[in-house]
Amino acid sequence: MTSYMAIDGSALVPLRQKPRRKTQGFLTMSRRRISCKDLGHADCQGWLYKKKEKGSFLSNKWKKFWVILKGSSLYWYSNQMAEKADGFVNLPDFTVERASECKKKHAFKISHPQIKTFYFAAENVQEMNVWLNKLGSAVIHQESTTKDEECYSESEQEDPEIAAETPPPPHASQTQSLTAQQASSSSPSLSGTSYSFSSLENTVKTPSSFPSSLSKERQSLPDTVNSLSAAEDEGQPITFAVQVHSPVPSEAGIHKALENSFVTSESGFLNSLSSDDTSSLSSNHDHLTVPDKPAGSKIMDKEETKVSEDDEMEKLYKSLEQASLSPLGDRRPSTKKELRKSFVKRCKNPSINEKLHKIRTLNSTLKCKEHDLAMINQLLDDPKLTARKYREWKVMNTLLIQDIYQQQRASPAPDDTDDTPQELKKSPSSPSVENSI
């Protein structure tokens, strides 16, 4: 049961209340905690591919799910016997249309401009059209959800159990009351203001999460109640700052309200304090902590830096691959595929392309001639060369013999003015060479 405190007989302020911990619009528990059997008769069901949010570089970006449409709710399960849904979408808050930006065929999306976009894909065009019609009718005919009802839920972020907040330890309130009594006995002129400043300091020192700040403020309120009675007995004026929060305030509204309460209470304190007290109070303000950056923004920054690092590593690997270098910087031997690619590469200048092509053909011709010459030298250097071996070699290298004969016929006849003997000038014909061997 919640107790209330009346201040100046005008407003009722709750002293202790269980905070509402909201995660993606949960009211009591997640609607994904329902099995396929418990859903009963479905309006439409079947296997669909769902695009992953954080797909790795080489893994598959689409995963197959058993999807069930029940009224205005869309559930997807890992299999037909699953006890809990992997995801849930409340369709009246979303729009359904084809996803032309996806490379996968038969894809459609369920999107919301301010919440999220889900991508699904069917096996064929017929299934995609059936799902689009069913989802479109569910979006149009059903009424929009209330603000307290969840819009979507997924299994990537586990649902926290909604448990009652544990009360603060008793020794904390005792120590705060003891310090308050010591301060009232030592400096009676600052009794009321010290208590209000302690509650204000607890209000300003708010961490990034909202429920913890609520608990701190509620812990300080009972201490201020105890201080009110002591201050009234002494007849001192009391300055008390009360901040009433809405059930679900925005983060900007929290900071704005804190700043306003801090400014108003500070002006009241400075008017009632002397110069020495104001100097000490300003020194205390210097030590006030500033709320940290929200946890969500930190996670987004980490993800962005990670993506940029992955992109840099990918670029570095591709540049090493293009330069035929190993990750350690060593020269990597070229493969046949890379050599073939390098041969196909062409320059924009046609004259240079012709010259390069001619050089490549001459190099290949030179290699062939060197190979033929090595075969002929191997035959002539054989000390055990016989007619039978020559005939076998001739049958095996018929093309080489024909090439030699053609070159001899195409070569110009030697002049008579040479000093070579007459019998050497006449080249022997092929039949005579064969007969002599």
Swiss-Prot record:
UniProt domain PH: residue ranges: 41-140
- Put simply, this protein is called Interactor protein for cytohesin exchange factors 1
Q: Give the species.
A: Homo sapiens (Human)
- Function recorded in the entry: Enhances the promotion of guanine-nucleotide exchange by PSCD2 on ARF6 in a concentration-dependent manner.
Positions of the region Disordered?
143-225, 273-307, 406-437
Matching InterPro entries: CNKSR, PH-like_dom_sf, PH_domain
Question: Which GO cellular component term is one of those annotated?
Answer: cytoplasm
Task: Quote the biased-composition stretches of kind Low complexity, using this chain's numbering.
Answer: 172-200, 273-283
User: At what positions is Phosphoserine found?
Assistant: S411
Required for interaction with CYTH2, as annotated region: 389-437
Where is the stretch described as CRAC domain? 315-320, 339-348
Task: Show the ranges annotated as biased composition (Polar residues).
Answer: 201-214, 427-437
